[in-house]
UniProtKB/Swiss-Prot annotation:
<protein>
    <recommendedName>
        <fullName>Meiotically up-regulated gene 116 protein</fullName>
    </recommendedName>
</protein>
<dbReference type="GO" id="GO:0005739">
    <property type="term" value="C:mitochondrion"/>
</dbReference>
<keyword id="KW-0472">Membrane</keyword>
<dbReference type="GO" id="GO:0051321">
    <property type="term" value="P:meiotic cell cycle"/>
</dbReference>
<feature type="compositionally biased region" description="Basic residues">
    <location>
        <begin position="86"/>
        <end position="98"/>
    </location>
</feature>
<feature type="region of interest" description="Disordered">
    <location>
        <begin position="81"/>
        <end position="101"/>
    </location>
</feature>
<feature type="transmembrane region" description="Helical">
    <location>
        <begin position="20"/>
        <end position="39"/>
    </location>
</feature>
<keyword id="KW-0812">Transmembrane</keyword>
<keyword id="KW-1133">Transmembrane helix</keyword>
<dbReference type="GO" id="GO:0031966">
    <property type="term" value="C:mitochondrial membrane"/>
</dbReference>
<keyword id="KW-0496">Mitochondrion</keyword>
<comment type="function">
    <text>Has a role in meiosis.</text>
</comment>
<keyword id="KW-0469">Meiosis</keyword>
């Protein structure tokens, strides 16, 4: 598990970087989280766990509790469309979206260590890190 000291250190580093590198919050947070993951070890006895969460301004940052199978790094901004009902979409549009999802799935970074995935979030820009343990 991520210790309280490690959590505070990552939190402090994030706040420092947020102050001086405004446009790179998510990038730096991802780097530090991956670095933190490498240090941690995965407990085989663990079936499920919750990661410590920090709410930092308009971002919700979830830090992994152990070496993840992959990190789902989801980032959405105003460039993404608001969610629509499936019934309203045309067949061509659905096919195009499915193709985009497939491309995203194939673009795995560091052999499935970090996966960039788009989400529809029309309220605000959010940066979320989710971890899954490899058993």
């Amino acid at each position: 598990m991520v210790s309280r000291v490690e959590s505070v250190i990552v939190f402090a580093l994030y706040k420092f970087l947020q102050r001086y590198f405004h446009s790179f919050h998510c990038f730096f947070l991802l780097c530090f989280t991956v670095m933190l993951c490498v240090v941690q070890q995965c407990s085989s006895a663990m079936t499920s766990f919750r990661c410590p969460t920090f709410s930092l301004s308009k971002y919700t940052c979830v830090l992994p509790a152990s070496i993840p199978e992959m990190i789902l790094f989801t980032f959405s901004s105003h460039t993404f469309q608001t969610p629509t009902k499936k019934g309203n979409k045309t067949k061509k549009k659905r096919k195009k979206e499915k193709k985009k999802e497939t491309i995203v799935e194939k673009n795995k970074v560091l052999k499935s260590f970090a996966l960039y995935k788009k989400i529809n979030n029309y309220r605000s820009t959010r940066c979320v890190l989710v971890c899954q343990c490899k058993y």
